[in-house]
């Protein structure tokens, strides 16, 4: 079964890109609540986040089996946010990410690299960035534009 084979060596074709850990740490030290909203089954996303050492940065890891509908529906995002948020955004790399953010009424930032078959600048995101280290600047620009 695919899931068993993939789970057996979950990090074989996965990598943590430059700047991810430092940026997540920066966001956390400033009080940001962070969630992973993925269409990857939770058993796999939990294992991948643990194996890469990233799980501790996130308040929630939400796979499709932990929500009412998978992306591009907004359920992942709305459930991860709960309520009472003043500023929120989605950082992703694909068309379903951008569509999910739009459906939730949130701005989106997409990476110019990742799993999208389409060029990042054609996905309709509010910002396209080329390094994860650019997330804080992109967020600041979004908040200024919405003020």
Please give the residue ranges for each predicted region:
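Metal-dependent phosphoesterase signature
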Residues: 1-25, 30
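Short, flexible loop segments at the rims of nucleotide/cofactor-binding pockets, characterized by
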Residues: 11-14, 39, 68-69
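Asp-based, Mg2+/Mn2+-dependent phosphohydrolase catalytic module
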Residues: 25, 29, 41-42, 46-147
């Amino acid at each position: 079964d695919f899931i068993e084979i993939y789970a057996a060596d979950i990090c074989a074709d996965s990598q943590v890109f430059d700047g991810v850990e430092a940026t997540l740490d920066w966001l956390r030290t400033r009080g940001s609540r962070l969630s992973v909203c993925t269409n990857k089954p939770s058993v796999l996303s939990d294992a991948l986040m643990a194996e890469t050492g990233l799980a501790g940065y996130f308040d929630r890891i939400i796979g499709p089996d932990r929500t009412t509908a998978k992306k591009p529906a907004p359920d992942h995002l709305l459930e991860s946010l709960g309520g009472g948020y003043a500023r929120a955004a989605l950082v992703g790399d694909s068309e379903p990410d951008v569509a999910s953010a739009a459906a939730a009424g949130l701005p989106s930032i997409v990476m110019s690299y990742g799993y999208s078959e389409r060029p990042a600048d054609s996905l309709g995101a509010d910002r396209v960035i080329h390094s994860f280290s650019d997330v804080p600047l992109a967020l600041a620009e979004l908040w200024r534009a919405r003020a």
